[in-house]
Every structure is written in C-alpha cells, then in structure tokens.
C-alpha cells in the first residue's frame, strides 16, 4: 500500500493582492502521511522588502520591525519546494495562498522552477461549503463546529493555523476515529523554537487507533503550537 503524503499549508501576507505589491511574510507547512501528523514541518518568517500596512498587522500581529532581520524569500525557496515536493497541498481558500506563492516564485525568474498548480490542492473552504451549505466557513467557525481548541488564536499565524487546519481537515474527511493516528510531536515543537526546517528526518508512523491518552497528547501539542508560534 502506497503512502499518501499531504502538506497542510498556510501563509500570512502584507495584503490581499500580490499585483498591488503585497508579499508573503510567513509560511507554515505541516506534513501528514496517511492522515497522520509526522512531526515534520516547514516554518519561516520572511522579509517582504516593503512596509507592513496596519490593516495586515491587525490580522497577524507581524510587524515590519520584526521582519527586518528575517530571510528573503529567494533564500528559502529551494527548501520550501523540496519540503512540499509534489505532495497534495491542503489549504483553506487555496486560490489566495497559491497566487501569492506563485507570485513569489515568479519573482525569482528561474527557469528551473515550475509554478504551483491549483489542481494539486485540496481546498478545505470548498469542502466545508459542500458539506455544510449555508454555514460559516472560516477557520474559527470550523474549529467551533468540530470542537477543535483554538482558544490561543487571538491573531492569525501560518504555522498555528496550519495545525488547526490539520484537525479540521481530518474532521471534514470523516473524523479522528476513522483517520487520525497520533505520533510524537517533539520535532514540531523543537522547530517552533528554532525556526528551522527539518525536511531530512525520517520518522516512523505508528498505525493504531487513537486512545484517549493519545488524543489528550494531541490537544497538548496543539496548545503548545498556539502558545509558541510567535
């Protein structure tokens, strides 16, 4: 049986439209194999080489001053592309993130880099609209519907929102009991502290039904992401 690798991905930006000069300021991506979080992630804050509009700052709390010493996109592009590889991307409102990522990639002017394809994404916003017509579909509303603890989400954040989306996605696919197995999350937590990408480490997936203890460990893991993502 072949493994299904998926990447839960989110970005934060300086605004709504890259055609108006807006840029990505944070990328958070979490690896899932056969609906199991492996503990591997990619997370970087990025210097957008421009100011931070107050409207965007109010949403994610990332200031221009904070981003001054952060890497430029071109310095992390290869690591990012290696991490996502050709895996399916799970994104909430995928067209938004894909247009920004492709804008950043196009600015590199490299013939060896292909732009990302929207066809290679699963849009959880579209899924939610199909399953729950007439309801609210933002991440907070879906967390509330599925009883996912998002109490630490006062502001948006790419990595912590990707972690929440991972839970929501599993619920949209049928729920924890049918798909969500637990693994050790220490690698993710360590990466949060060091802002490093760990895309070389192989980890063993434990294929079992989640016990109450494992589900509690997952809640604790999610809580730590929400508290330490900034």
Swiss-Prot record:
<dbReference type="InterPro" id="IPR006054">
    <property type="entry name" value="DnaQ"/>
</dbReference>
<feature type="binding site">
    <location>
        <position position="10"/>
    </location>
    <ligand>
        <name>a divalent metal cation 2</name>
    </ligand>
</feature>
<keyword id="KW-0235">DNA replication</keyword>
<dbReference type="GO" id="GO:0003887">
    <property type="term" value="F:DNA-directed DNA polymerase activity"/>
</dbReference>
<keyword id="KW-0479">Metal-binding</keyword>
<feature type="binding site">
    <location>
        <position position="12"/>
    </location>
    <ligand>
        <name>substrate</name>
    </ligand>
</feature>
<keyword id="KW-0548">Nucleotidyltransferase</keyword>
<dbReference type="InterPro" id="IPR036397">
    <property type="entry name" value="RNaseH_sf"/>
</dbReference>
<protein>
    <recommendedName>
        <fullName>DNA polymerase III subunit epsilon</fullName>
        <ecNumber>2.7.7.7</ecNumber>
    </recommendedName>
</protein>
<comment type="subunit">
    <text>DNA polymerase III contains a core (composed of alpha, epsilon and theta chains) that associates with a tau subunit. This core dimerizes to form the POLIII' complex. PolIII' associates with the gamma complex (composed of gamma, delta, delta', psi and chi chains) and with the beta chain to form the complete DNA polymerase III complex.</text>
</comment>
<keyword id="KW-0460">Magnesium</keyword>
<feature type="binding site">
    <location>
        <position position="161"/>
    </location>
    <ligand>
        <name>a divalent metal cation 1</name>
    </ligand>
</feature>
<dbReference type="GO" id="GO:0008408">
    <property type="term" value="F:3'-5' exonuclease activity"/>
</dbReference>
<feature type="binding site">
    <location>
        <position position="55"/>
    </location>
    <ligand>
        <name>substrate</name>
    </ligand>
</feature>
<comment type="function">
    <text>DNA polymerase III is a complex, multichain enzyme responsible for most of the replicative synthesis in bacteria. The epsilon subunit contain the editing function and is a proofreading 3'-5' exonuclease.</text>
</comment>
<keyword id="KW-0378">Hydrolase</keyword>
<dbReference type="InterPro" id="IPR013520">
    <property type="entry name" value="Exonuclease_RNaseT/DNA_pol3"/>
</dbReference>
<feature type="binding site">
    <location>
        <position position="60"/>
    </location>
    <ligand>
        <name>substrate</name>
    </ligand>
</feature>
<keyword id="KW-0808">Transferase</keyword>
<feature type="binding site">
    <location>
        <position position="161"/>
    </location>
    <ligand>
        <name>substrate</name>
    </ligand>
</feature>
<keyword id="KW-0540">Nuclease</keyword>
<dbReference type="InterPro" id="IPR006309">
    <property type="entry name" value="DnaQ_proteo"/>
</dbReference>
<keyword id="KW-0464">Manganese</keyword>
<feature type="binding site">
    <location>
        <position position="10"/>
    </location>
    <ligand>
        <name>substrate</name>
    </ligand>
</feature>
<dbReference type="GO" id="GO:0003677">
    <property type="term" value="F:DNA binding"/>
</dbReference>
<keyword id="KW-0239">DNA-directed DNA polymerase</keyword>
<keyword id="KW-0269">Exonuclease</keyword>
<feature type="active site" description="Proton acceptor">
    <location>
        <position position="156"/>
    </location>
</feature>
<feature type="binding site">
    <location>
        <position position="12"/>
    </location>
    <ligand>
        <name>a divalent metal cation 1</name>
    </ligand>
</feature>
<feature type="binding site">
    <location>
        <position position="10"/>
    </location>
    <ligand>
        <name>a divalent metal cation 1</name>
    </ligand>
</feature>
<dbReference type="InterPro" id="IPR012337">
    <property type="entry name" value="RNaseH-like_sf"/>
</dbReference>
<dbReference type="Pfam" id="PF00929">
    <property type="entry name" value="RNase_T"/>
</dbReference>
<dbReference type="GO" id="GO:0045004">
    <property type="term" value="P:DNA replication proofreading"/>
</dbReference>
<dbReference type="GO" id="GO:0046872">
    <property type="term" value="F:metal ion binding"/>
</dbReference>
<dbReference type="GO" id="GO:0005829">
    <property type="term" value="C:cytosol"/>
</dbReference>
